[in-house]
Amino acid sequence: MSTSKATATYLRSIMLPENGPASIPDDITERHILKQETSSYNLEVSESGSGLLVCFPGAPGSRVGAHYRWNLNQTALEFDQWLETSQDLKKAFNYGRLISRKYDIQSSTLPAGLYALNGTLNAATFEGSLSEVESLTYNSLMSLTTNPQDKVNNQLVTKGITVLNLPTGFDKPYVRLEDETPQGPQSMNGARMRCTAAIAPRRYEIDLPSERLPTVAATGTPTTIYEGNADIVNSTAVTGDITFQLEAEPVNETRFDFILQFLGLDNDVPVVTVTSSTLVTADNYRGASAKFTQSIPTEMITKPITRVKLAYQLNQQTAIANAATLGAKGPASVSFSSGNGNVPGVLRPITLVAYEKMTPQSILTVAGVSNYELIPNPDLLKNMVTKYGKYDPEGLNYAKMILSHREELDIRTVWRTEEYKERTRAFKEITDFTSDLPTSKAWGWRDLVRGIRKVAAPVLSTLFPMAAPLIGAADQFIGDLTKTNSAGGRYLSHAAGGRYHDVMDSWASGSEAGSYSKHLKTRLESNNYEEVELPKPTKGVIFPVVHTVESAPGEAFGSLVVVIPEAYPELLDPNQQVLSYFKNDTGCVWGIGEDIPFEGDDMCYTALPLKEIKRNGNIVVEKIFAGPAMGPSSQLALSLLVNDIDEGIPRMVFTGEIADDEETVIPICGVDIKAIAAHEHGLPLIGCQPGVDEMVANTSLASHLIQGGALPVQKAQGACRRIKYLGQLMRTTASGMDAELQGLLQATMARAKEVKDAEVFKLLKLMSWTRKNDLTDHMYEWSKEDPDAIKFGRLVSTPPKHQEKPKGPDQHTAQEAKATRISLDAVKAGADFASPEWIAENNYRGPSPGQFKYYMITGRVPNPGEEYEDYVRKPITRPTDMDKIRRLANSVYGLPHQEPAPDDFYQAVVEVFAENGGRGPDQDQMQDLRDLARQMKRRPRPAETRRQTKTPPRAATSSGSRFTPSGDDGEV
């Protein structure tokens, strides 16, 4: 990433390949050119309207895919053509590697006489090879993957699909493009030689058993010996030797033809056939051999190969009964290789795009763009300017971290074209460090991208600790970029813009490093990561290192390194994963950046950054972003570990340089910085003066206090054998440490009391108050987390005040208000029983689900405090309105002025409501209730009940009417 532009150019080229190529910012710095190649095809749809596109999105060469058509009955595939870049790259370039690639697949051309396009597209990215796909039908394509970012289904052909290549790895090598080599003038016509693509070939080997060959059906008819899957898209070489013998001497000379056929995806017609023939006679029938030796160039691979078949045939009818047995002179086998087959992207992954029900003779357009890093051939190189690749850890690891979150950021390998076009704006924002990410905010990604930027973008020293868990140890970040400008060596990381990033140097030498900087220590130690606690080692030794950075000249700070047996390279940062050897290969050490000039004890050790020593002897180590330790102190510590320490870890830190007599320790520089690092762990520094403990002034009394407990201290076996005074130091320092420090503490306190200084008096009071209230450990941990006392200053800036009287209502009033509020909400929800008094008895809680169901089912008020869990899953069967039931019963039974319905009829209506879950009767139930009412009304009266007789009405006179007055035939 260039410093002149705040843009992640490599990531932009991956996301938006049409914007052009950008150099891969890894540590492969070959001179190369950048080139963009296009691919454009108008594929005609067959009569079946269905077909298949096989895409190789990561292939580093010119072949980017293939097109197949289904036959009219859609029972078999038919190969149509390769899909390639517009220029055959191997004609002008020797090596290359792919940067990015994209395909757009859609249809927009109407055949004559049509006014609308039909058809849909299915697409899926498969992590395996083409031969591993079980079914290639349109509907089964979606079962290739369960990842939603890797498939699209039922997209209209007019809308289109976009296939985007996402890297499957980094630090990929340049691949030979199978260019032809120059040849002499006497070469015969047609003869040529090429450099095969064999950096990482995929090799296949057919091993045949030492058994009888299957019997052939007739002469000239091949009989299959073996068939299986194999993926080949470019040149291959076949070698092999099939040895066999016959049971009896052949009557006539018999020719055995062993045939190796390379088959495609569509049919059983061989793409390439390799045949090896041998003549079996009476002289060699007990040990005949057929040898394969043939090279097949890429031009002969006319379509993708997915299968191979090995068969044999005879030319003599009489030889059919004379059985042949394999393995007469050794194992029978045939092998062949697929050039570049194991390079990521060549054979896997693949993307399959199937189309269906398209109009015959319509055109399916494939438009692709591929970006490459290419190395020209010698002729072209004379007239073309090439440039070195730039190692840009920020740009590379920003791309890695973004792609490692592709699920959260919804970065797909297969897109609906309109969705990809909508997403291009967000991609441009992600690759622009100056953008405030407004579009990403709308998608909900801004916080994630900002977090990645904070880790990846500021400086290299803050990048790798956070990135390591995401991208692993794939990058050997520093590589061979080493400048040895001192005894310790210095590792530098150079960015594309020409500036150096902060990479901590680990000094264990006597060179002048600089003055102690607390600010630098705080800033860089905050990047440490991945702490691991190890059980108490069998033995070990501790030595200090001094760290510096290029961006802060003259500043330094120290840390400790513990060397223990066994190999633990996985506990080291990738920058420190360096293996050094003792003299004459008598042992090795991980984490030391230079070979050891003396012999070891044939053991392997590891130098680990020390975080903490536990009371039980366990050690806590951590990963730090720094180079491996070097210099005299590391050699001194290793000499002690190999020759003088048999068990345990001495509770002290060793520094110095071994003199030529291998006994005296020569003082070295940087002792004050190393002493501070040792005191932070409560350990003394040994070796700054011959035979005398360090005498370094320190302003902090607490830094001299040694933690409780003790690690086992090994007494030197044969004192003064290697280093003078070592045995005396190791015996006396640890044993007299506690008494000496107690005297030092008492003397310091006595001197402090004599000083009439208010500040000292306050400090003493503060120490006493801290110890009295058992706050020492808490304050110490706080000081490590808040070294500048920013948070603590805010916390204690306002002293505590007397408790004020609470404002507002008292507790009883507040609870009553709470009960009233809950009661109102419960009544609104249908719990009429939930009065404020009931809520108070229910511990000021509303009705539980069980209590509410109990009331709805039984109609009774639940007891406060009981949960009625048995009623939670019961259905509500009790009718909620008894007045409604009574009115309905009276209405069905009779008119309002008649007598009310009997209790039996009420019960029948209640049962109907209960059966309906509280709802009224339906039409059939209503008719049943009417029939029941009529039956109840017709019930016979008891026998003792007399039927009341009524007086019959008086009969009217025959001549009277209401229009004539009564009388004896009077006239009107």
UniProtKB/Swiss-Prot annotation:
What's in the GO CC field?
host cell cytoplasm; T=13 icosahedral viral capsid
- The name of this protein is Structural polyprotein
Q: Name one GO molecular function term.
A: structural molecule activity
Primary role: Capsid protein VP2 self assembles to form an icosahedral capsid with a T=13 symmetry, about 70 nm in diameter, and consisting of 260 VP2 trimers. The capsid encapsulates the genomic dsRNA. VP2 is also involved in attachment and entry into the host cell.
Q: Which Pfam families match?
A: Birna_VP2 (PF01766), Birna_VP3 (PF01767), Birna_VP4 (PF01768)
Which organism does this sequence originate in? Infectious pancreatic necrosis virus (strain Jasper)
UniProt cross-references to InterPro entries, sorted A to Z: Birna_VP2 (IPR002662), Birna_VP3 (IPR002663), Birna_VP3_dom1 (IPR043048), Birna_VP3_dom2 (IPR043049), Birna_VP4_Prtase_dom (IPR025775), Viral_coat (IPR029053)
Q: Which UniProt keywords apply?
A: Capsid protein, Host cytoplasm, Hydrolase, Metal-binding, Protease, Serine protease, T=13 icosahedral capsid protein, Virion
Q: Does the keyword Ribosomal protein apply?
A: no
Q: How is it modified after translation?
A: Specific enzymatic cleavages yield mature proteins. Capsid assembly seems to be regulated by polyprotein processing. The protease VP4 cleaves itself off the polyprotein, thus releasing pre-VP2 and VP3 within the infected cell. During capsid assembly, the C-terminus of pre-VP2 is further processed by VP4, giving rise to VP2, the external capsid protein and three small peptides that all stay closely associated with the capsid.
For this chain, the annotated S-S bridges are: none
- What are the residue positions of the site described as Cleavage? A442, W443, S486, A487, A495, A496, A508, S509, A734, S735
Task: Check the record and name the SUPFAM superfamilies matching this protein.
Answer: Positive stranded ssRNA viruses
Disordered: region residues: 797-817, 917-972
**Basic and acidic residues bias locations:** 801-817
**Residues forming the catalytic site:** S633, K674
**What EC number(s) are associated with this protein in UniProt?**
3.4.21.-
Gene3D superfamilies per the UniProt record, alphabetical: 2.60.120.20, 3.30.230.110, 6.10.250.1030, Birnavirus VP3 protein, domain 2, Capsid protein VP3, domain 1, icosahedral virus
